[in-house]
UniProtKB/Swiss-Prot annotation:
Changing residue 210 to L: In allele C1-B73. The keyword Protein transport does not apply. SMART domains: SANT. Controls the expression of genes involved in anthocyanin biosynthesis. Regulates the expression of at least 3 structural genes: chalcone synthase, dihydroflavonol reductase and flavonol O(3) glucosyltransferase. C1 acts as a trans-acting factor. CDD domains: SANT. This is Anthocyanin regulatory C1 protein.
Length: 273
């Protein structure tokens, strides 16, 4: 079951409305009010369809219709309402006083829909601008696209600078790894240098009674202290700079260990005696 036709199609006039027909329709609606559009053609003496009479009155002959071009604020509101309501033109027209759904639909299909489609494809939001800028609505992402285009044009105009920029951006500082092959030994420099003719201070000794034992321990202590003064440095044995021979560091470490063993051996012999 389809919807019943509003009127018979035989003998119905089609095409543009004349001023005489407009006056007859306006006079009838003002006298009888809106509604019952199927009876309007017969009572008004019009050879038109009832639907055609209704649309002619609502879209063109109403006294409260707002004439003129759609303003920029109205364009912005139409775009926002279309995002929420879609193609429900009657609901959109109800929020724009004086505008008809047919006018809004035609304006969207002819002008505004193309701009909104281009803005949605670019991934930006639409902002309605003032008329002195030369455009009614421009996407917010246009500025980013313009900057990208200017940068690419500058690179094409000056290829040498573009190559320099790429090289400087790709240069990364990477420190060279240094391999440490041994332990780090730190020695403290003796702050009291030994003058000529002075004797080394004994590290362990008694009074006047322990002559032989004290003499042997003093000799060992003197040898150890002298070896420490000779081989002492503020820097570690393994500096790792690679400028000198690394065998010198090994020899210095070996001599220190031998002198240390001699000193321990002397201490042990003195305690046992």
């Amino acid at each position: 079951m389809g919807r019943r036709a509003c009127c018979a199609k035989e003998g119905v006039k089609r095409g543009a409305w004349t001023s005489k027909e407009d006056d007859a329709l306006a006079a009838y609606v003002k006298a009888h009010g809106e509604g019952k559009w199927r009876e309007v053609p017969q009572k008004a003496g019009l050879r038109r369809c009832g639907k055609s009479c209704r649309l002619r009155w609502l879209n063109y002959l109403r006294p409260n219709i707002r004439r003129g071009n759609i303003s920029y604020d109205e364009e912005d509101l139409i775009i926002r309402l279309h995002r929420l309501l879609g193609n429900r033109w009657s609901l959109i027209a109800g929020r724009l006083p004086g505008r008809t759904d047919n006018e809004i639909k035609n304006y969207w299909n002819s002008t505004l829909g193309r701009r909104a489609g281009a803005g949605a494809g670019a991934g930006g939001s639409w902002v309605v601008v003032a008329p002195d800028t030369g455009s009614h609505a421009t996407p917010a992402a246009t500025s980013g696209a313009c900057e990208t285009g200017q940068n690419s044009a500058a690179h094409r105009a000056d290829p040498d600078s573009a190559g320099t920029t790429t090289t400087s951006a790709a240069a990364v500082w990477a420190p060279k790894a240094v391999r440490c092959t041994g332990g780090l030994f730190f020695f403290h420099r003796d702050t009291t240098p030994a003058h000529a003719g002075e004797t080394a201070t004994p590290m362990a000794g008694g009074g006047g009674g322990g002559g032989g034992e004290a003499g042997s321990s003093d000799d060992c202590s003197s040898a150890a202290s002298v070896s420490l003064r000779v081989g002492s440095h503020d820097e570690p044995c393994f500096s790792g700079d690679g400028d000198g021979d690394w065998m010198d560091d090994v020899r210095a470490l070996a001599s220190f260990l031998e002198s240390d063993e001699d000193w321990l051996r002397c201490q042990t012999a003195g305690q046992l005696a």
